[in-house]
């Protein structure tokens, strides 16, 4: 995906050295693919962890933490040209927190939409897919318009901040209406 493109255009020399020295991989595209796969793996494998955290702390508190972390890391990525190893770690953490946020969202869904859970999971999955596509396009636009990814990371941080504000606007109503009826942690 686009993470490979980002890594290739920003850290090609570092990835080439890492690929040859550590992985014995002469093809830098393969090395970039490994790093992209590692970050995607973090997002996928940690979804249940996010759900478990939301079961303990509540979905809203969990989303605040996960989205807050993503927002902060996106701001850091927009503000600084990070060294290669730190950039990989930051991307890993962004994807891990997005995956855990997914688990937290699905902790809330059955409480709010118990009778319509099938359609709601479909709608939420669709929104996630469209959001991922929009993110890719935003990074592509950023690279084309500004020859870098700063604007893409900044827009990503703004969108995540808007999500945090959206949660803040509805949390009291959620807790005093369906949250009480559901009996779960929201």
Where are these regions (language model features)?
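Multi-pass alpha-helical transporter architecture, strongest
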Residues: 157-186
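Cytoplasmic membrane-interface "Motif A"-like loop-to-helix N-cap segments
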Residues: 55-67
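Helix-to-loop junctions at the C-terminal end of transmembrane segments
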Residues: 46-58
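A membrane-interface helix-boundary motif in multi-pass transporters
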Residues: 141-159
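Interfacial helix-cap and linker-helix signal at transmembrane-aqueous boundaries
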Residues: 7-8, 53-54, 138-147
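C-terminal ends and interior cores of transmembrane alpha-helices
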Residues: 68-82
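Extracytoplasmic gate region of multi-pass secondary transporters
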Residues: 1-45
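Intracellular juxtamembrane helix-capping segments at the cytosolic ends
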Residues: 100-113
């Amino acid at each position: 995906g686009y993470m490979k493109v980002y890594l290739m255009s920003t850290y090609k020399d570092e990835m080439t050295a890492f690929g040859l020295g550590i992985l014995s991989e002469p093809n830098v595209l393969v090395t970039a693919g490994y790093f992209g796969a590692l970050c995607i793996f973090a997002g996928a494998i940690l979804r249940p962890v996010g759900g478990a955290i939301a079961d303990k702390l509540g979905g809203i508190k969990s989303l605040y933490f996960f989205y807050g972390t993503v927002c902060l890391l996106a701001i850091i990525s927009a503000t600084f040209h990070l060294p290669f190893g730190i950039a990989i770690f930051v991307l890993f953490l962004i994807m891990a927190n997005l995956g855990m946020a997914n688990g937290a969202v699905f902790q809330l869904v059955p409480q709010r939409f118990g009778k319509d859970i099938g359609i709601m999971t479909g709608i939420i999955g669709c929104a996630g897919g469209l959001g991922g596509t929009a993110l890719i396009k935003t990074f592509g636009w950023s690279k084309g318009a500004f020859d870098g990814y700063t604007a893409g990371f900044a827009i990503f941080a703004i969108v995540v901040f808007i999500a945090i504000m959206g949660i803040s606007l509805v949390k009291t109503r959620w807790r005093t209406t369906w949250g009480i009826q559901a009996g779960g942690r929201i």
